[in-house]
């Protein structure tokens, strides 16, 4: 069992290293710029004391526009050097050393896609968030050109690894082929099971995953076309969820007396009725006909 866990931890670390390396490419930088623009407008509306980011894509960070008092970056590997104005913590995402109900917002930039146990990470996010806290997710859209390209390179890398085990798989792929892409619908279902309400789902980066910066600049018109037409599938999506906590409202009992049957006294206490019958002599509790017969 220990060997199995160590194997998955090694795969997760390897995936994050490859993702971080991919974000230094021209395509990665173009996507990162779109993700920062999508987050900046959102973070300006998030207030509180503590903001946590699980996973780091580059040394610039994604919390530049945050208005929270404290920002923390939690990673599962060696942190990026010279990350400005953020405190670092290296730990496992499945067991966060954070108190319950102590974080106002959590950012997960593709975190669920490159971790072995996304369900446990979501449970940890639900645990550390305060009531009405925000969870912000960035993800790749599997039903887009990015998803098809990811699947293609995933299969190609698998075949290449069988033929040449010494060749690094990320040398072949123009985008991070590791990990498992999670659709908006699946993530929404997971969050609703944990008691979250979905506030916002937006999409970004409608251009295909082309490694050439020149071609990406020429296809800049696809961004506006995708936002207005709603036909082109976007490469990435932003999902915002709010943690809801149900509370019990105590209801004060209402005491009142109700009218009962003649000869009995009815008392109603907190909705419970009780008939109090008088202790009558059986000889007096006879009908009129029976009394006449006895008199004769």
Feature-to-residue mapping (PLM):
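A short acidic, Gly/Pro-enriched loop at the edge of an enzyme's catalytic core
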Residues: 94-106
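Conserved catalytic loop of SAM-dependent methyltransferase domains
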Residues: 197-222
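C-terminal lobe and adjacent flexible extensions of AdoMet/dcAdoMet transferase-like proteins
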Residues: 214, 220-296
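Class I SAM-dependent methyltransferase SAM/SAH-binding core
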Residues: 37, 41-96
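Short alpha-helix
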Residues: 152, 177-201
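A short glycine-rich, Lys/Arg-flanked "PGG" loop and its adjoining helix->strand segment in the class I
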Residues: 119-134
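Class I SAM-dependent methyltransferase Rossmann-like catalytic core
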Residues: 2-45
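Conserved class I S-adenosyl-L-methionine
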Residues: 134-171
């Amino acid at each position: 069992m220990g060997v199995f866990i160590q194997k998955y931890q090694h795969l997760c670390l390897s995936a994050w290293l490859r993702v971080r390396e991919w974000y230094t490419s021209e395509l990665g930088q173009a996507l990162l710029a779109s993700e920062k623009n999508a987050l900046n407008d959102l973070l300006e509306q998030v207030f509180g004391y503590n903001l946590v980011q699980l996973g780091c894509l580059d040394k610039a960070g994604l919390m530049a526009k945050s208005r929270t008092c404290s920002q923390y970056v939690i990673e599962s590997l060696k942190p990026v050097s010279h990350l400005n104005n953020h405190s670092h913590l290296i730990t496992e995402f499945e067991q966060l050393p954070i108190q319950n109900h102590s974080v106002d917002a959590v950012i997960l930039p593709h975190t669920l896609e490159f971790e072995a146990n996304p369900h446990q990470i979501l449970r940890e996010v639900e645990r550390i968030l305060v009531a009405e806290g925000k969870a912000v997710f960035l993800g790749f859209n599997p039903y887009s050109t990015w998803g098809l390209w990811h699947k293609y390179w995933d299969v190609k890398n698998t075949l290449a690894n069988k033929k040449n085990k010494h060749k690094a798989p990320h040398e072949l792929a123009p985008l991070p082929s590791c990990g498992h892409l999670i659709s908006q619908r699946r993530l929404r279902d997971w969050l609703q099971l944990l008691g979250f309400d979905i506030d916002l789902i937006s999409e970004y980066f409608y251009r295909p995953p082309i490694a050439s910066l020149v071609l990406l600049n020429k296809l800049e018109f696809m961004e506006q076309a995708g936002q207005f037409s709603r036909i082109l599938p976007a490469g990435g999506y932003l999902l915002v969820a709010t943690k809801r906590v149900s509370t019990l409202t105590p209801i004060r009992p209402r005491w009142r007396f109700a009218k009962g049957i003649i000869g009995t006294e009815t008392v109603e206490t907190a909705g419970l009725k009780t008939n109090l019958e008088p202790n009558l002599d059986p000889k007096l509790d006879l009908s009129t006909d029976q009394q006449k017969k006895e008199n004769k």
